[in-house]
């Protein structure tokens, strides 16, 4: 875990740093004495846990805690202070704990263990979601052509395009043509890997071979089977995000 200690008193920061090192299990322990240093640290690192004093030189710790909680993925906040009158406000901010100075190692360890337990639970939930998505990626997509239903493995589908009422499904070893609308297949494909890049095209991001600059500030996607599909302007933002350009 990564920890950030925010306190304007050097001795308090040093003591907390020492105690956390004694507890162990921290990849990184950093310090900040004011709001400016705090914001800079939060821009550089993604912390799991923050120890926050209430009385800072340039801002109230409760107000700073409220700002931190507005982050997309806020760290766990443990208020570490000499003042007990802010406890209610702290817990209204969903603080994990509220510890009074002087610090004791047992009390600090108790607070750290709360964060670790929550983090382990969240990690397990995230892993379950990823596993579910991976399992879904192994599922087959039923494609009806004439009097046959072809079961296509999703990982083998390179891209799907539609033109003049004909939908073409490109796979690693074949090409299938059907009159079914693109929307029908889009609903059944795993959104972790498949993305709509145009009103007429859906691609499997695992099968992108190359992306070229195209007209009107768009892109041309070349898939692993050599098929080219253009990214529509209204789909540019989602496409960039899917390949890590945003």
From Swiss-Prot:
GO cellular component, one term: cytoplasm
Domain HTH LytTR-type: 141-245
Modified residues (4-aspartylphosphate): 53
Localization per record: Cytoplasm
Main subcellular localisation: cytoplasm
Domain of life the protein comes from: Bacteria
Pfam families per the UniProt record, alphabetical: LytTR (PF04397), Response_reg (PF00072)
Quaternary state and interactors: Homodimer; when phosphorylated.
NCBIfam families: PRK14084.1
Protein name (Swiss-Prot/TrEMBL): Transcriptional regulatory protein LytR
Species of provenance: Staphylococcus aureus (strain bovine RF122 / ET3-1)
């Amino acid at each position: 875990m990564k920890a950030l200690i925010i306190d304007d008193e050097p001795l308090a920061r040093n003591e907390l740093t020492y105690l956390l090192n004694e507890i162990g299990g921290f990849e990184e322990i950093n310090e900040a004495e004011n709001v400016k240093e705090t914001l800079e640290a939060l821009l550089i690192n993604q912390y799991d846990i923050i120890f926050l004093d209430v009385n800072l030189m340039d801002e109230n710790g409760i107000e700073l805690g409220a700002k931190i909680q507005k982050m997309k993925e806020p760290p766990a906040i443990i208020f570490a202070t000499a003042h007990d009158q802010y406890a209610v406000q702290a817990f209204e901010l969903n603080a994990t704990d509220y510890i009074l100075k002087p610090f004791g190692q047992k009390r600090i360890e108790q607070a750290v263990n709360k964060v670790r337990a929550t983090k382990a639970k969240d990690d397990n939930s995230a892993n379950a979601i990823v596993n579910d998505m991976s399992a879904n990626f192994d599922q087959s997509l039923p494609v009806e052509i004439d009097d046959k239903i072809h079961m296509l493995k999703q990982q083998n589908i390179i891209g799907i395009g539609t033109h003049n009422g004909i939908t073409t499904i490109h796979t690693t070893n074949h090409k299938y043509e059907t009159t079914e609308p693109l929307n029908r297949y889009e609903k059944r494909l795993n959104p972790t890997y498949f993305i709509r890049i145009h009103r007429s095209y859906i691609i499997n991001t695992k099968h992108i071979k190359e992306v070229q600059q195209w007209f009107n500030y768009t892109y041309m996607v070349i898939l692993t089977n050599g098929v080219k599909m253009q990214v529509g302007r209204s789909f540019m933002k989602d496409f960039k995000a899917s390949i890590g350009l945003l």
